[in-house]
């Protein structure tokens, strides 16, 4: 064997020995990391930044091991945090406002979105009848909502109901004339495709599934930021007990930064973020067909902020929406939108 070959082979052997020697050390370091539990309200793509952070192991890179579960709704997600069975809840900001009104101890430390991510979908034949597309003037699309029959929603008072009332009011319509059918989230796509309801609004991919099937048409993808009152708006947020984050500042910072880094990737390297999201268990090819994933990604991407910090202006919009939705019934209980009560940037920091 030539000397050069021997040197090359020796280098390979040395590299392998080093790798094997370091493997137990890496495992030990991971074992020493604090473990945190994060519950999400649901498993849709409004939480795309969190899924990418999980897929690319950003939590481990920030120094924590994250166990992520789906709670099956915003209320059980928040209750799990309040009851200390999980450390963090990823859910909607208007839900945190409701928690405040009810006296539950929660604070937002990071924002996954900068706009509501709901997609308002109507039956395709109605979109054709009204001669509407996503390029039609927004006001024309809003006015069509007043002409609908039964509208599907997850439950009474949920954001999937309140968004229709808000948008109809915005266009000058009478929200009291809207008729809602409460079916739960998983049943809504099939209900529209079988003509049980004329419309519904959920975050991707629920509405996009109906469009890919040729039965529905998304006339208002709110994630694109067409409605000013619902843009620059912290929608899905990371919340925790105030006492927990104060007692575990490094952990809170690690989790908030991991999700924010994943969100930043959608802007700095969108194809890398897209590939990671496509590989995740909730949105891989076995779960979502290509057309549904592409529609969903295009809707969600613009709603993901460059970083997860929040502002008082954004929280004013959340509080205004919550007030209009009837979440805040007593004017004396309207919370401040300033940092320190409902939210804080002290953990998420800056890029």
Model-derived features with residue positions:
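Secondary-structure end/capping motifs
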Residues: 246-328
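Conserved C-terminal helix/tail region of periplasmic/extracytoplasmic solute-binding proteins
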Residues: 316-351
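Short, solvent-exposed loop/beta-turn-alpha elements that line the ligand-binding surface or hinge
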Residues: 61, 128-133, 225-231, 299-312
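Sec/Tat signal peptide C-region and signal peptidase I cleavage site
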Residues: 22-28
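Pocket-lining segment of extracytoplasmic ligand-binding domains
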Residues: 187-280
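Bacterial N-terminal signal peptides that target proteins for export
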Residues: 2-13
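Bacterial N-terminal signal peptides
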Residues: 11-21
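Short, glycine-/small- and polar/acidic-enriched structural segments
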Residues: 29-173, 179-182, 198-204, 221, ...
């Amino acid at each position: 064997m030539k000397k050069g070959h021997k040197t090359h082979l020796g280098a390979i052997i040395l590299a392998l020995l080093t790798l094997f020697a370091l493997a137990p050390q890496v495992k030990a370091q991971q074992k020493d990391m604090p473990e945190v539990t994060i519950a999400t309200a649901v498993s849709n793509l409004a939480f795309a930044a969190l899924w990418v952070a999980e897929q690319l192991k950003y939590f481990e890179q920030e120094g924590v091991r994250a166990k992520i579960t789906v709670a099956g709704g915003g209320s059980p997600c928040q209750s799990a945090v309040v009851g200390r069975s999980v450390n963090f809840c990823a859910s909607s900001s208007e839900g945190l406002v409701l928690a405040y009104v009810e006296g539950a101890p929660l604070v937002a430390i990071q924002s996954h979105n900068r706009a509501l991510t709901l997609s308002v979908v109507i039956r395709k034949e109605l979109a054709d009848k009204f001669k509407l597309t996503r390029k039609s003037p927004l006001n024309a699309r809003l006015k069509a909502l007043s002409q609908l029959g039964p509208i599907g929603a997850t439950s009474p008072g949920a954001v999937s109901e309140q968004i229709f009332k808000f948008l109809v009011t915005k266009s000058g319509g009478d929200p009291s004339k809207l008729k809602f059918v409460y079916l739960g989230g998983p049943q809504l796509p099939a209900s529209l495709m079988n003509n049980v309801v004329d419309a519904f609004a959920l975050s991707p991919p629920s509405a996009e599934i109906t469009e890919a099937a040729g039965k529905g048409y998304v006339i208002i993808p709110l994630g694109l930021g067409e409605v000013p009152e619902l843009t620059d708006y912290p929608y899905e947020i990371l919340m925790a007990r105030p006492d927990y984050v104060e007692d575990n500042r490094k952990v809170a910072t690690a989790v908030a930064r991991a999700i924010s880094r994943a969100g930043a990737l959608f802007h700095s390297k969108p194809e890398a973020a897209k590939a990671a999201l496509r590989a995740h268990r909730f949105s891989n090819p076995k779960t979502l067909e290509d057309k549904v994933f592409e529609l969903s990604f295009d809707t969600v991407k613009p709603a993901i902020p460059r970083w997860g910090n929040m502002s008082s202006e954004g929280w004013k919009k959340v509080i205004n929406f919550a007030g209009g939705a009837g979440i805040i019934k007593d004017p004396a209980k309207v919370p401040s939108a300033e940092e320190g009560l409902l939210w804080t940037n002290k953990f998420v920091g800056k890029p």
